[in-house]
C-alpha cells in the first residue's frame, strides 16, 4: 500500500474511492492544494484564538456580503450555537445554564413540511422544536399564529425552490419573524451554488448556517453569517468563550484547530472567486471517461445528467434489471477491491437511497440505476471505477 495510506493499513483499514461526494460518513471533503498549504502555514505559528476568530469572521462576512461571520465546527455546530445565542444572548448566567433553559424563551418554530434529518440540531442546546402546519403544507397565518411568549426564533430549512406552495417562503417567514421581534435561523448547509444564490442566502436571514466541507474546507468546519447583533451572541457560546469572562459556554465541545479556521476561510474565498464552469468541466470529463468504458457492457447504458446539487452533474448508470439490480451493483462496488462507494447508505447495511435526492445520487423508485459523483474522485481513480464495474457485470 502507498506511503500515505500506511497507517490505514496498520489499523487494518481499507481506504475507499468516494464516488458519492461530500458525505460525512466517508470523510467529508478534499481540500485543494492552496487550502492545505494555508493550513500547514497556520500550524507553524500559534495565535490568540479570539483575535483569529474576530478577523476571520470579518473576512468571511466581507466575502459573503453579510454584517458579521464566525467559523464553527460544522453546520450542525453553527445551528446549535445559533439557537444557544438566541436563548442566552451574552448573559453569563444564562450561558452557563444551557442546555437547561429555565427562565428563558426556548421554543423554535419549524414548518412541518421542512422537517429534515438534521433538524435535531435546533434542539441540542436545550431548545424545544415546535412543528407548525401539516406535513404537506404550512400557511403564513399558521406560522404567525404559532408565535407565543416562549418563541425565541423561527428555523428555516433553505431549499432552491423556496418550498413553492408547500411552506411559507423565506422572505415571508423573515417578515413574520421581524414583525414579532424574533430572529430567523436559516439552515443552508449545502446551498452554495450558484454563487449569487449563496450570497442571497447569506445576506437575508438573521443567522445563516453553512457546512464548509461542501466548498472544499476541512471536513469538521462550517460558518455562520448574519446580523452582527446575533453573530455576537453566537460567539458568546463558543469554545473559546468558555474561558472568557467566566461564561462556561456549552460550545466548549465544539472545538476547532487554528489550521481548520484558516482552511475554512481560504476555501470559502476560493469558492466564491473560482470559475465554476471549469470545475464542472473537470467532473464531466471524469464522468465521460467512465461512461465510455462501460457503455459497451451488455445491459448497461450511461450518461452525464444534471442533478439539483452544487456539483450539478453526475454519471447516471442504467442497468438492465435482468442483468443485475442497481443495489446489488452498489453493494458489490462497496465491498470489493478497491472499495468504491457510489451512494450514501439509507441505513448501515444499504449503499443506495430510494430516490434521486438533493445529495444527487441513489436509485430511482421503479427504475434501476445509480449515480456516480466524481467531485471527490481523483484522476487515477477514474479507471478503477470503470474497470471494477466491468469486472462485476462481466461475471
Predicted features along the sequence, with ranges:
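A glycine-/small-polar-enriched, mobile loop at the entrance of the PLP active site in fold-type I
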Residues: 17-55
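A short, amphipathic alpha-helical segment
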Residues: 40, 269, 386-394
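A common structural junction motif
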Residues: 239-243, 334-341, 390-395
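Conserved C-terminal alpha-helix-loop-beta "cap" of PLP-dependent enzymes
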Residues: 7, 295, 299-385
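Gly/Ser/Thr/Ala-enriched C-terminal appendages of enzymes
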Residues: 256-257, 283-295, 318
Amino acid at each position: 500500500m502507498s506511503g500515505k495510506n500506511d497507517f490505514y493499513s496498520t489499523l487494518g483499514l481499507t481506504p475507499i474511492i468516494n464516488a458519492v461526494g461530500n458525505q460525512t460518513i466517508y470523510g467529508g471533503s478534499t481540500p485543494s492544494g492552496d487550502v492545505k498549504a494555508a493550513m500547514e502555514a497556520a500550524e507553524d505559528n500559534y495565535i490568540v484564538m479570539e483575535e483569529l476568530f474576530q478577523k476571520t469572521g470579518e473576512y468571511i462576512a466581507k466575502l459573503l456580503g453579510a454584517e458579521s461571520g464566525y467559523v464553527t465546527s460544522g453546520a450542525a455546530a453553527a445551528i446549535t450555537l445559533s439557537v444557544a445565542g438566541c436563548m442566552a444572548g451574552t448573559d453569563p448566567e444564562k450561558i452557563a445554564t444551557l442546555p437547561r433553559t429555565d427562565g428563558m424563551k426556548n421554543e423554535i418554530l419549524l414548518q412541518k413540511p421542512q422537517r429534515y434529518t438534521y433538524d435535531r440540531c435546533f434542539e441540542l442546546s436545550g431548545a424545544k422544536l415546535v412543528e407548525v402546519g401539516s406535513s404537506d403544507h404550512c400557511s403564513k397565518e399558521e406560522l404567525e399564529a404559532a408565535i407565543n411568549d416562549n418563541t425565541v426564533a423561527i428555523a428555516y430549512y433553505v431549499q432552491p425552490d423556496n418550498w413553492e406552495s408547500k411552506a411559507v417562503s423565506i422572505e415571508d417567514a423573515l417578515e413574520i419573524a421581524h414583525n414579532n421581534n424574533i430572529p430567523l435561523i436559516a439552515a443552508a448547509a449545502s446551498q452554495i451554488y450558484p454563487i449569487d444564490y449563496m450570497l442571497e442566502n447569506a445576506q437575508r436571514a438573521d443567522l445563516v448556517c453553512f457546512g464548509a466541507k461542501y466548498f472544499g474546507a476541512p471536513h469538521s468546519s462550517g460558518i455562520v453569517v448574519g446580523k452582527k447583533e446575533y453573530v455576537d451572541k453566537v460567539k458568546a457560546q463558543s469554545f473559546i468563550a468558555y474561558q472568557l469572562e467566566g461564561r462556561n459556554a456549552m460550545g466548549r465541545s465544539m472545538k476547532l484547530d487554528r489550521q481548520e479556521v484558516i482552511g475554512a476561510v481560504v476555501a470559502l474565498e476560493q469558492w466564491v472567486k473560482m470559475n465554476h464552469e471549469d470545475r464542472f468541466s473537470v467532473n464531466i470529463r471524469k464522468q465521460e471517461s467512465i461512461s465510455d468504458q462501460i457503455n459497451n457492457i451488455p445491459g448497461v447504458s450511461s450518461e452525464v445528467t444534471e442533478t439539483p446539487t452544487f456539483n450539478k452533474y453526475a454519471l447516471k448508470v442504467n442497468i438492465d434489471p435482468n442483468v443485475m439490480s442497481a443495489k446489488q451493483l452498489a453493494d458489490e462496488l462497496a465491498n470489493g477491491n478497491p472499495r468504491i462507494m457510489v451512494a450514501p447508505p439509507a441505513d448501515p447495511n444499504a449503499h443506495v437511497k430510494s430516490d434521486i435526492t438533493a445529495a444527487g445520487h441513489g436509485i430511482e423508485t421503479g427504475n434501476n440505476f445509480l449515480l456516480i459523483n466524481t467531485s471527490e474522485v481523483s484522476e487515477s481513480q477514474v479507471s478503477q471505477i470503470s474497470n471494477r464495474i466491468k469486472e462485476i457485470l462481466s461475471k
